[in-house]
Structure formats: structure tokens, C-alpha cells
A protein has these predicted regions:
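Aromatic- and Gly/Pro-enriched helix-to-coil junctions and flexible linker segments
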Residues: 61, 75, 95, 102, ...
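Alpha-helical transmembrane segments
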Residues: 13-25, 119-130, 176-196, 259
Length: 410
């Protein structure tokens, strides 16, 4: 019954997380586009009011004319819309989902005992420390180098090195699936922390100074803009880290941390293409296509590099006369497979517990799920999760032979 409610919690939290993330990413991408597309106003009246750029656009049958002030307007309106709830809601729902999906069952989903044999409490503590330590290191880098000459390039290079190291470390300490998600959560935490600790406080200071008649220090807007730009480059790498959980060939690869780094780098390069594309149309920067091409080349390179070796075609018992199994005329029997399932699978898919509502402890139910068992246990090797029950390659091969011979139940 507990697994039933956990599945519902997982589904609903995932739904909320996707909804809030769409809202946050959508508004973030829009304002990056807006900043890249602004042109100096032609109207002297607008320039006299302090407007530094404007955009004319049409959408949904209406015309829009957003304007951006160089620093701030002389008088603020009574109602001022703020963009921060999207960020906070995304992080809170994501943290809740991470807790339900991984921390709640750390021994199953977070820990791979072949990598680190530690307690659930220790694994949870270290996982949470990844979120905090990365934010602290990233923030120190930004404060130390962000305002220097070529500060953006220096910060970008240093943060990339830190992300590479964190990816390697996470894949050495945690189960691959959890490691990928943890790196994504680590970066996403820094994104939301940028909003909470820098962007919104700086904007509140600016608004307070305006309302109280004090001169506005432009540094607050500059810092907020810098962190906002960082967030836009973090977005696609985080999305890959989250989506990769559904594709075990990424995080089960021997060099999984390199796979993660390459795909996140490709995401950042592709995001750079979109950022520069708007300015290119206005003649402000060079052609953005090289970034997209390099990003695409990184992805293609990863696909070719990760390509599994060709396997010999499976020969049916009736077609091959040289193998012992063929001579016998049949693959492994049900009782042989049942012994493996009893030791490796029934604790999560038996009469007492049915994770994901999958039960395998009767011939009828096993026959029903035979394709899934073969796919998850033999092809992707995703199950047992993190190999918590210690299934051997020989046992996986036995299940594969049984399935390819027709998954017989006698």
C-alpha cells in the first residue's frame, strides 16, 4: 500500500514540477529574447523618460511594445509585477520530488553498493551537501571574478570545471541514475538561489530607493542581469540531466560522467545559439550557427562513441545444431528462471510488495510481464535497481536465453 501512495505522490509532484518549470523557463527565455531584441527608441519622449530600448511585436492578434529603462523610471506605478514565484515553486516541487523518489528509498535508488557501501543517512547527507557546496563555490566564483575584465568568460570556464568534477564525483559515489539527477538538482539549486539571494534582493533595493527618492545604484541591476544570464545557460543542461533518468544507456555507461558532461555542454552551446540569434538579426554579433553546429557535433560524437559493440545474432534452437542447448531442443526451463527471480526480484515484485504494480511470482503474471523483464533485466540492465540484489551476468544471460526460447512456463 505504501508503494501505491508513493507512486501517486511521485506522479503529482512530477506534474507540479513540470508545470512550474515550464512557467519559469518560459518567462526566463522570453526576457532573454527581449533583452537581445531591444533597439534604441526612436521617440525623443521615450529617451527623455530614460527608456534605453524597446521592442515592437505581434502575438495572438495583438500588438505589444515592451520598453526597458536604462536604470529605472522616475516614478514607479502602483502595481509592479515580480517574477520569482515560478523559480521558488519549481525548486520546492523538485526538492519534494527528489525526496519522494530518491531520499525516501535511498538504499534502493540512491546507493549503489558496488560503488560506495554506506548507510542511507550518510548517502542522503552527502547528496544534500552537493546542492549546498556547489552553490557556495559557484557564488564565490561569481563574486571573485564576475566584475573583472572578461569576467563572464572566466566565470564560465571555472564553473564548467567545477561541474565536471562534481559530475565525476557523483558518478563515483552514487548510483548512475541518481548521480545524473543529483548533478541536475545541484545546478538547478544554484539557479533558484541566484533568484533568491541576488536577483530579487537587488530588485527590492532598487524599488525601495526609487520609492524613497534615493539615487539608484545600477550595480544591483547589473548583478541581477549577470545571474539571470547564467541561469539561461544552465537551463538545457539541467533538462538533459532530468530527462536522462528515462534512458539507462546514458547513466549505466562505464564513462557515465563524461556522457553527462558532454550532453550538458552541448545543451549550453545550443542555448548560446538561440541567445545570439536574436542579436544577429539586428546586426549586433556574428552568425550563431557555429554554436549550434558544435553542439550538434558533440551530440553526434557522443552517440558514435557510446555505440555498443555488435552482438552476434541470436540463433534459434532449431537452426543451430552445434550448441548444447540446441541439441537439447530447448532453452532454460521455468524452474531455473524462477530460482533467479526468487532471489533477485520477488522482494520488490512478489506477493508482499509490487513496485510499479508489477508482480512476477506466478507463471501467469510472469508470462504477462516477460517482455518487460527481458528488456529491463537483460537489455538495459536497469533492474534490479542499482543491482541492489546482486544479480550476476550469468543470471541475466539465463533470463535472456529463456525469453528468446519462447518464455515457456514448464
Amino acid at each position: 500500500m505504501e508503494s501505491y501512495y508513493l507512486d501517486w505522490a511521485n506522479l503529482l509532484l512530477r506534474w507540479v514540477h513540470v508545470i512550474t518549470a515550464i512557467a519559469w523557463i518560459g518567462s526566463s527565455f522570453y526576457f532573454v529574447f527581449l533583452d537581445s531584441s531591444l533597439v534604441p527608441p526612436e521617440s525623443k519622449e521615450l529617451r527623455d523618460r530614460g527608456v534605453g530600448g524597446e521592442l515592437w511585436a505581434i502575438h495572438g492578434g495583438g500588438f505589444y511594445n515592451p520598453q526597458k529603462y536604462t536604470v529605472a523610471p522616475k516614478v514607479l506605478p502602483d502595481h509592479l509585477h515580480w517574477f520569482y514565484l515560478e523559480s521558488y515553486s519549481t525548486w520546492l516541487s523538485g526538492m519534494a520530488l527528489f525526496t519522494v523518489s530518491y531520499l525516501w528509498s535511498a538504499s534502493t535508488y540512491l546507493i549503489d553498493k558496488s560503488l560506495m557501501h554506506w548507510s542511507s543517512g550518510a548517502a542522503i547527507g552527502v547528496a544534500l551537501s552537493f546542492l549546498v557546496v556547489f552553490w557556495m563555490v559557484y557564488d564565490l566564483i561569481c563574486q571573485a571574478f564576475g566584475q573583472r575584465k572578461n569576467g563572464d568568460a572566466i566565470v564560465g570556464a571555472l564553473v564548467f570545471v567545477v561541474v565536471c568534477f562534481a559530475s565525476w564525483l557523483a558518478c563515483q559515489w552514487f548510483a548512475g541514475r541518481a548521480a545524473f539527477l543529483l548533478v541536475g538538482a545541484m545546478i538547478a539549486t544554484a539557479m533558484s538561489a541566484n533568484v533568491f539571494f541576488w536577483i530579487i534582493p537587488g530588485q527590492r533595493t532598487t524599488v525601495k530607493d526609487l520609492r524613497e527618492g534615493r539615487p539608484v545604484d545600477p550595480i544591483h541591476g547589473q548583478r541581477a542581469k549577470q545571474r539571470s544570464v547564467h541561469n539561461t545557460y544552465f537551463t538545457l543542461p539541467v533538462l538533459f540531466a532530468m530527462l536522462s533518468n528515462h534512458y539507462s544507456f546514458t547513466y549505466t555507461n562505464k564513462y557515465n560522467w563524461i556522457v553527462l558532461v558532454l550532453m550538458m555542454l552541448a545543451g549550453a552551446l545550443i542555448r548560446q545559439f538561440f541567445v545570439m540569434r536574436h542579436g544577429y538579426k539586428l546586426g549586433r554579433n556574428s552568425h550563431p550557427w557555429p554554436y549550434a553546429l558544435v553542439g550538434g557535433a558533440v551530440i553526434v560524437g557522443a552517440i558514435v562513441w557510446m555505440k555498443p559493440p555488435l552482438q552476434a545474432a541470436v540463433v534459434s534452437p532449431s537452426a543451430a545444431s552445434t550448441s548444447v542447448a540446441t541439441a537439447a531442443g530447448a532453452g532454460p526451463g521455468f524452474m531455473e528462471v524462477k530460482k533467479v527471480l526468487e532471489q533477485r526480484c520477488y522482494m520488490c515484485h512478489g506477493s508482499a510488495v509490487q513496485m510499479k504494480n508489477v508482480r512476477l511470482d506466478t507463471p501467469e503474471l510472469l508470462k504477462q510481464h516477460a517482455q518487460s523483464v527481458y528488456q529491463q533485466t537483460v537489455v538495459s540492465k536497469l533492474m534490479p535497481m542499482n543491482n541492489a540484489t546482486g544479480i550476476t551476468d550469468a543470471e541475466r544471460a539465463l533470463i535472456g536465453q529463456w525469453f528468446r526460447a519462447g518464455a515457456k512456463m514448464e
